[in-house]
Amino acid sequence: MSYFIDTSILGRLANASDVQHTVATRAVLELHRRGEGLHVAPQVMIEFRNVATRPVAVNGLGLSTADTETLAATFEARFSLLPETPDIYPAWKALVGTLGVIGKRVHDARLVAVCHVHAVTHLLTFNVGHFTGMAGFRPGVVVVDPTSV
């Protein structure tokens, strides 16, 4: 199996004081122990930089750009970075068009499309509800809450 690591996981891994830090860490370590493929996409790394450098007062981590770059480099070394390919846009377009995905969820739909194009079978996220209804869109992806790993 292979697992796509969502931005919500990276944010918790980066913040040791977050109440879900331990859950995220244990889930990733367990998947690694099992020999599962662990992947991120450029979109997730971009979203991570957004959250990491955003002030704490507006739901960010409040990290410096230097600290953010160090963490991003660690994540890029730990997780396989899936390439952007021309097949992602048509897969995303089919998903949002068929399911009528709108608003902020179009970004989540793109992550599902990345999983489809790269044959990633599972998506690890704290935001399971964001992917409701999209996971079953063929070829499908299993959305996994880290507490269940």
PLM region spans:
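Short, well-structured N-terminal submotif of metal-dependent ribonuclease cores
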Residues: 1-40, 57-66, 70, 133, ...
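Acidic, PIN/NYN-like endoribonuclease modules and their adjacent C-terminal/linker elements
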Residues: 2, 109-149
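Hydrophobic helix-cap positions at the C-terminus of alpha-helices
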Residues: 30-31, 75, 95, 99, ...
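Active-site-proximal, substrate-binding regions of enzyme catalytic domains
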Residues: 52-80, 86-88, 92
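Active-site neighborhoods of divalent-metal-dependent phosphate/nucleic-acid chemistry enzymes
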Residues: 80-128
